[in-house]
């Protein structure tokens, strides 16, 4: 998920705008899971009850399901959810995909062992970022882990989502969370996007209470 659609300088703000992006192929929809999540799954880090927040067309969610997890994927865009359901059916994978708002995850009414975030954190402005963290707190069980991939400040230019610093990540999760790692990573984009693979942060953050 990115903050700006292809060829646009205006941030996406509404559910309708997010949905409109999926009339085509958005630049973050590569048709495969991001490599950092593949490595995490292979290392046994995606197990139990898993939520893929801002799941798009479901690649991270289906990766988790293929590794035996019980998976829910939520996205604000109905077209993305429709595509995700079709892909999961084609691949013979059981994933529950629902239209939902990342700022209101409490509406799911359940908690998860693992929450995956591929490009959601970085779409929020300063006002909505604390709301998103509070929303996450409602669904990550105590001791559970939230894994996120976001653009870093090392990515040049201003195309796409806002850049995030390590200090911003640590500050956002200072209360009620334990930052276990923040590592440089790569965020892959689809062919033809204005940027190639971009510099990113990959973080693992545990819910401490």
Describe every region a protein language model picked out:
Residues 119-123:
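Short catalytic micro-motifs in class I SAM-dependent methyltransferases
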């Amino acid at each position: 998920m990115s903050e700006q659609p292809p060829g646009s300088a205006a941030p996406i703000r509404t559910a309708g705008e997010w949905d409109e992006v999926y009339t085509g192929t958005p630049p973050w929809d590569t048709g495969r899971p991001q490599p950092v999540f593949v490595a995490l799954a292979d290392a046994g880090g995606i197990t139990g009850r898993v939520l893929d927040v801002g799941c798009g067309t479901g690649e991270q969610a289906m990766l988790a399901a293929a590794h035996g997890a019980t998976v829910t994927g939520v996205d604000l865009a109905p077209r993305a959810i429709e595509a995700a359901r079709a892909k999961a059916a084609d691949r013979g994978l059981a994933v529950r995909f629902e239209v939902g708002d990342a700022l209101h995850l409490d509406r799911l009414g359940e908690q998860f062992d693992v929450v995956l975030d591929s490009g959601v954190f970085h779409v929020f402005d300063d006002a909505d970022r604390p709301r998103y963290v509070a929303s996450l707190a409602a669904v990550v069980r105590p001791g559970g882990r939230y894994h996120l991939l976001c653009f870093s400040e090392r990515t040049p230019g201003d195309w796409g989502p806002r850049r995030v610093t390590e200090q911003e990540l640590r500050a956002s999760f200072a209360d009620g969370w334990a930052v276990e790692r923040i590592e440089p990573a790569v965020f892959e984009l689809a062919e033809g996007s204005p940027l190639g693979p971009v510099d990113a942060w990959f973080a693992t953050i545990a819910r401490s209470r």
